[in-house]
């Protein structure tokens, strides 16, 4: 299934002969609706027809609206795409009792995937600095199993992130101006690329959560507060390093001399992340697109909430 992102000003989205038509001043592009899973609007000045919205609703195609950072601020789904009540009841009950256990598993996997990302680049760029970071991350992934509270988990996560990003900064795998990790609102180019990439990843995670009927605002690790999709942030953790960080590192030559992330860079980053998510990886002995792995992982998490499955985070092989 296709996930389409509109990042140009002045685009019109309509319906022609049962297909989505994307129009600008110079040309038209057509996309069959039966191959479309989501459409994200990442630019102001985009218009669309009510006929198209009706077809999206009938077919279960989700329409996301992203802010300038690429973060979804609105989602339009059909009235028939209701939540699965029992799935959410299971989620509420489980998280109330088992938040710590699940958080430990998830952040241990995040650290292992950070380590896999460093190993991936160390294959071709032999570095003592990277090797030291790889060994320290291995140690932290074991230590986190001793965490007694959610604050302990967050402490291990923060320490591992510092080791990971410091090693990338020392060997200049990101921009020359990258010194440490900065969140939303950062003006530093590599951090801006990372932040936009994470926002794109979050729309895939949100889509998978919605398909499973879970509550995106009820997470187990990240703080619960109005407007914050805590479960989306939680489930992103195991994919951040491999899906986004690795892509941003590979694109370094495209942005190393730029001061800010422009429309062209955003388009390149979107395309590369989409290519990564469309790539096939081994999952339970079969080769599946990462998009499908993410969905299966969310269904498996829903199964753990119901007491039917044991959730195992996905670990990437380098």
Curated annotation (Swiss-Prot):
State the Gene Ontology BP annotations. defense response to virus; maintenance of CRISPR repeat elements
Q: Which Gene3D superfamilies match?
A: CRISPR-associated endonuclease Cas1, C-terminal domain (1.20.120.920), CRISPR-associated endonuclease Cas1, N-terminal domain (3.100.10.20)
Q: What else is known?
A: Part of a type II CRISPR-Cas system.
Q: Which organism is it from?
A: Francisella tularensis subsp. novicida (strain U112)
Report which superkingdom the organism of origin falls in: Bacteria
UniProt lists the family membership as follows: Belongs to the CRISPR-associated endonuclease Cas1 family.
Instruction: Give the InterPro entries listed for this entry.
Output: Cas1, CRISPR-assoc_Cas1, CRISPR-assoc_Cas1_C, CRISPR-assoc_Cas1_N, CRISPR-assoc_Cas1_NMENI
Q: Which Pfam families match?
A: Cas_Cas1
A GO molecular function for this record? DNA endonuclease activity
Q: What is this protein called?
A: CRISPR-associated endonuclease Cas1 1
The annotated phenotype of a deletion mutant is:
No effect on expression of bacterial lipoprotein FTN_1103. Bacteria are as virulent in mice as wild-type bacteria.
Could you say which EC number(s) this protein's record lists?
A: 3.1.-.-
The function of this protein is: CRISPR (clustered regularly interspaced short palindromic repeat), is an adaptive immune system that provides protection against mobile genetic elements (viruses, transposable elements and conjugative plasmids). CRISPR clusters contain spacers, sequences complementary to antecedent mobile elements, and target invading nucleic acids. CRISPR clusters are transcribed and processed into CRISPR RNA (crRNA). Acts as a dsDNA endonuclease. Involved in the integration of spacer DNA into the CRISPR cassette.
Q: Where are the transmembrane segments?
A: none
Query: What class does this enzyme belong to in the EC scheme?
Result: hydrolase
Quote the record's binding site residues for Mn(2+).
157, 222, 237
User: Which residue windows are coiled coil?
Assistant: none
Q: How does it assemble?
A: Homodimer, forms a heterotetramer with a Cas2 homodimer.
The alphabetical list of record keywords is: Antiviral defense, DNA-binding, Endonuclease, Hydrolase, Magnesium, Manganese, Metal-binding, Nuclease
> What does induction of this protein depend on?
In culture expression is high during early log phase (1 hour), decreases and then rises again in late stationary phase (16 hours). During infection of mouse bone marrow-derived macrophages (BMDM) expression is maximal after 1 hour, when the bacteria is expected to be in the phagosome.
What cofactor(s) does the depicted protein rely on? Mg(2+); Mn(2+)
């Amino acid at each position: 299934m296709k996930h389409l992102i509109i990042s140009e000003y002045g685009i019109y989205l309509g319906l022609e002969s049962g297909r989505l038509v994307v129009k600008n001043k110079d040309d038209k592009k057509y996309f069959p609706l039966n191959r479309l899973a989501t459409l994200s609007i990442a630019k102001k000045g985009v218009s669309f027809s009510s006929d198209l919205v009706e077809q999206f609703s009938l077919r279960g195609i989700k329409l996301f609206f992203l802010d300038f950072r690429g973060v979804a601020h609105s989602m339009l789904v059909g009235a028939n795409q209701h939540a699965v009540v029992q799935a959410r009841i299971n989620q509420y009950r489980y998280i109330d009792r088992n938040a710590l256990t699940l958080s430990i598993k998830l952040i241990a996997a995040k650290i292992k995937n950070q380590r896999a990302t460093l190993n991936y680049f160390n294959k071709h760029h032999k570095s003592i600095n990277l090797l030291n970071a790889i060994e320290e991350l291995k140690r932290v992934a074991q230590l986190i199993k001793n965490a007694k509270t959610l604050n302990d988990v967050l402490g291990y996560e923060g320490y591992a992130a510092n080791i990971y990003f410091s090693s990338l900064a020392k060997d200049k795998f990101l921009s020359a101006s990258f010194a440490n990790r900065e969140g939303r609102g950062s003006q530093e180019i590599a951090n801006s690329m990372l932040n936009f990439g994470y926002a794109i990843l979050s729309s895939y995670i949100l889509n998978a959560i919605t398909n499973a009927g879970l509550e995106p605002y009820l997470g187990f690790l990240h703080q619960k507060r109005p407007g914050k999709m805590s479960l989306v942030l939680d489930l992103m953790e195991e994919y951040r390093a491999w899906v986004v960080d690795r892509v941003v590192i590979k694109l370094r030559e495209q942005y190393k001399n730029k001061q800010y992330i422009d429309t062209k860079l955003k388009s390149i980053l979107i395309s590369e992340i989409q290519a990564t998510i469309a790539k096939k990886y081994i999952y339970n002995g079969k080769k599946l697109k990462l998009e499908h792995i993410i969905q299966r992982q969310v269904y498996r998490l829903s199964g753990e909430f119901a007491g039917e499955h044991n959730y195992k985070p996905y670990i990437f092989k380098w």
